[in-house]
Design a protein with these regions (language model features):
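A structural signal for isolated positions on well-ordered beta-strands in alpha/beta enzyme cores
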Residues: 20-22, 60
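Catalytic core and acceptor-binding pocket of nucleotide-sugar-dependent glycosyltransferases
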Residues: 168-248
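Active-site-proximal specificity loops/subdomain of glycosyltransferases
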Residues: 29-110
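Acidic ATP/Mg2+-coordinating residue in the GHKL
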Residues: 25-27
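Short, acidic, metal-binding catalytic loop of nucleotide-sugar glycosyltransferases
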Residues: 10-19
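Conserved catalytic core of nucleotide-sugar-dependent glycosyltransferases
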Residues: 92-94, 121-202
Length: 268
């Protein structure tokens, strides 16, 4: 949502980073089917899109609100037998697959590499220290994802550096339809349980020593995460309460030197 995105950008700027920021805006109306067995809303619910329209210095917005860059309906149509039981409220919206495809597209749009930050994240330190070109990526690995039947490890997408030139050279991928959450019908397939960042991690492991990663076991102490900002888009009151509680990470003190804030806004 735009409020979370703006706060994320402001938190990055507050930590002294004046690097260019790219926001890939996938905002779109979301239809949540009526739940069964007490799961989900009683009636079909439509969450209206709320695009990020704020104009901020040093921030570029890639508008995909109408599928101009990635047509997700067309993408999902390639997998007519995709699993419909691995998602939220017993009906998958394939948010993970869309997320994965988006990051893979960013490899084309930002071929020199980038630091990936999720829009519902607030950073607590200068993230430019993650940019280390001797590594294929710098980030945090989640080994035991809750609810993952096969415990497939992954690189958390909340905050990580990806060295796109190195990764591309060695044939690593962020998206592989054989290893992507819910794109196959059979829930017993291990490949169906690869969440965002899992495919890339496996490729990096399989190409050692060509690709070496820098792991930050305590990287989660460098940021706080709202969790699920993309699919809780209708819960604006909850989001605002979370931002109010954590405003120290992005709000400028009243007596601060204005030069500290060169820009504002961000997220990928």
């Amino acid at each position: 949502t735009p409020e979370l995105t703006e706060a994320c950008i402001l938190s990055i700027r507050k930590q002294g980073c004046d690097w260019p920021i790219v926001v890939f805006d996938n905002s779109a109306d979301i239809t949540i089917p009526a739940g069964t067995d007490g799961n989900g809303p009683k009636e079909e619910t439509i969450i209206k899109a709320r695009p990020f329209k704020q104009k901020m210095k040093g921030v570029k917005v890639i508008d995909n609100t109408k599928g101009q860059v990635i047509d997700f309906e067309q993408f999902l149509s390639l997998y007519p037998d995709r699993n419909r039981q691995l998602g939220v409220w017993k009906s998958s919206v394939w948010g993970s697959a869309k997320h994965i495809v988006t990051v893979q597209k960013l490899w084309e749009l930002l071929p020199d590499g980038f630091i990936l930050v999720e829009s519902d994240t607030l950073v607590k330190r200068d993230i430019t220290e993650l940019w280390k070109e001797q590594y294929s990526f710098c980030g945090y690995v989640q080994k035991n994802q809750h609810g993952n039947r096969f415990k497939v490890p992954r690189i958390l997408p909340m905050l990580c550096y990806m060295n796109v030139p190195k990764l591309t050279k060695e044939g690593a991928r962020y998206f592989d339809p054989e290893r992507c959450w819910g794109l196959k019908a059979d829930a017993n397939l291990r490949g169906n349980w690869f969440d965002t960042g899992a495919c890339l991690l496996e490729d990096i492991i399989n190409t050692k020593p060509a690709l070496i990663a820098r792991l930050y076991p305590e990287l989660d102490k460098c940021y706080i995460h709202y969790h699920g900002g993309s699919w809780r888009g209708n819960d604006l009151e909850r989001q605002m309460a979370w931002l109010k509680k954590n405003e120290e990470y992005f709000k400028k003190p009243d007596n601060a030197d204005a030069k500290i804030f060169i820009c504002a806004h961000t997220d990928f």
